[in-house]
Amino acid sequence: MNNQKSKELFQEAQKYLVGGVNSPVRAFKAVEADPIFIKKGKGCRIWDVDDNEYIDYVLSWGPLILGHAHDQVINAIKQISNYGTSFGAPTELEVEMAKAVIDAVKSVEMVRFVNSGTEATMSAIRLARGYTKRKKIIKFDGCYHGHGDSLLVSAGSGVATLGIPGTPGIPEELASLTIVLPYNNIEAVEEAFEKYGDDIACVIIEPVAGNMGVVAPSKEYHQKLREITRKYGALLIFDEVMTGFRLSYGGAQELYDIEPDLTTFGKVIGGGLPVGAYGGKGEIMEYVAPVGPVYQAGTLSGNPLAMAAGLTQLQLLKQLNPYQELNEKGRFLEEGFKKISQETGVPVVVNRVGSMITVFFTDKEVVDFATAKTSDTKKFAKFFRCMLEKGIYLPASQFEAFFLSTAHSQRDLEDTLNKAYECFKQLS
């Protein structure tokens, strides 16, 4: 496969963009490769600047559940752009989009649109602190909630200890307000609340983890979280930036029948444009300005292009109800990867929830970040490079999810598994 133009562009990009990219994972460092530069996409396929064609399982990291350049989504963007791109003022589209989100997600009574998932989680944390008048928050090791300072925090030594900065630039004093616990460990949550319960504002969690690779919650885990947070008067925040409108129309909370106090959204609700949102019970959301004292604002929040794309995608998802189809596609890939593993003798653990999948190169059950990290990242990197060479575009990290869309056909899935078999044979 010829990647000459991509290589040249990457060399040029590094002169002007930090690391040559605008988000670290795009640099392909974790898979020991140079990034490919994409020029177009359609359906489940993308093409790079060297005209190489790929079946895409990244889908812009999840938003494109209907595939690239869906005709109706593109037409909605084109049509609304004729009237302007941003007004910094209320529009009818914002109201319609809010109604669509509230109609879909039972726990959401009011919503506020922002420009990214990071903004959504930062704002939800601020709101939780303002509403409860408490300082500490709980997050889970391996769950990513954007790059806000309170959330980019690593676990301290031992269970229920205060967090430490996950990157230079975050003050230790701020990091210490975040308690980082192991995912799927309800005893650790109970211990943290026994120790700090009166000062814990909220628990924020990916209801299905996607940023350590796909890790499903253990049975009754969310129900226990709901009970504990209610007992201590803390808010439960579901970060559904990845899972919202992907695992079901009502998100992971519909799948697991749990109502959090606040929910954050992103990805799918923007149809591929920059959008985030946070919403929840009216009495909590009314603490947000201009009604309440918790300040949050944004120049481009609710901009008409993003609202048009997002609303069209949500309307299509409601109409098509593709979730059973997506789940069946996911199951086909899951079973295919497991069969390939058995036939080639390359040990993997395949975790899947709906249309989100991760193939972990380990022989240990993956239930949290510690077990995810038993994966052989060097072996994954070889697998990634082999698949890329064969025209299959996967996430450039062992610890990310593969995403499926309605545009992936049975033939695409079979082609992917055939090529995966060839790559596994090279690894065995």
Curated annotation (Swiss-Prot):
Pathway: Porphyrin-containing compound metabolism; protoporphyrin-IX biosynthesis; 5-aminolevulinate from L-glutamyl-tRNA(Glu): step 2/2. The modification N6-(pyridoxal phosphate)lysine is found at residue 267. One of its GO terms (molecular function) is glutamate-1-semialdehyde 2,1-aminomutase activity. It is found in: Cytoplasm. SUPFAM superfamilies: PLP-dependent transferases (SSF53383). GO terms for cellular component: cytoplasm. It is an enzyme of class 5 (isomerase). It catalyses: (S)-4-amino-5-oxopentanoate = 5-aminolevulinate. GO terms for biological process: protoporphyrinogen IX biosynthetic process. Its cofactor is pyridoxal 5'-phosphate. Its EC number is 5.4.3.8. This is Glutamate-1-semialdehyde 2,1-aminomutase.
